[in-house]
Amino acid sequence: MPITRNLLLALSRSTRLRDLMIHFGPARTIARRFVAGETLNEAITAVQALSQQDLLASLDHLGESVTSETEARDATAETLELLDAIQTGGVRSGVSVKLTQLGLDLSPALAAENLERIVARSAEIGRFVRIDMESFAYVQPTLDLFEALWERYKNVGVVIQAYLYRSADDVARLIRLGASVRLVKGAYNEPPDVAYPLKADTDANYIRLAEQLFSPEGRASGVFPAIATHDTRLIDWARDHTRRQGIPPDRFEFQMLYGIRPTLQRQLTAAGYRVRIYTPYGPQWYPYLMRRLGERPANLFFLLRSFFRR
């Protein structure tokens, strides 16, 4: 990984820098490129605009690593309110959640309780919940909670990160369950004993994992793959592979991040593919912004120029 990205991922955990950035105008300007707003109303408006372009969405109230049960329950209540707004507004969106935001660091039982409240409410209104994957320490707890919930609910899916060595085994397990799987490259700073350090190796593993998900075994079990990438080469591979395998466009979807490559998003929908946009919102945008800056250094240079010109 480039040094710049490693540094930004480390800084994403700095509370002092967070407090500075959330009040720094240029940082807020850049954040609005990647975040649909700070309020629920702004988020719903953004998703309505996506719907007009035939784009689906997965809304996420930003936040992670809460430190109290009260914070975890407040985050759960916010997501339940979000679901009500989705139903009332009739927007084409599910929700994404992070288990550390629901209290996983405090107690797996607390996170499981809060997650089930969200999934149960989503099932009532016919919506889907995606459990985001966080850093390596949370992979197994996340999969454990997902599997426990999968026994009772089918409107829930999970995320697999291609840069982790263990992901092939995890995908095999999820195929046996017939789960919905979002496949991403991975955005956390992981050591080389658990993750591929080179982008080329991650990309190669991404294709291997996608082949697993698109395999006859995967199709037979009911797996629904979500190919989550902005990498044109991987998108072209997925289009070619599914065409050659006779997999119709309604048996998988592409997923991208809000504000990134909107022209490509529209091109894919025009070609008949399902495209879902991960759409984050809320005042806790700082860690998310730092991860996006790590992926796009040009935005970092703009931010630094603005800071030193104050």
Language-model features and meaning:
Residues M1-R310:
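Positively charged, amphipathic and often flexible ligand-engagement surfaces
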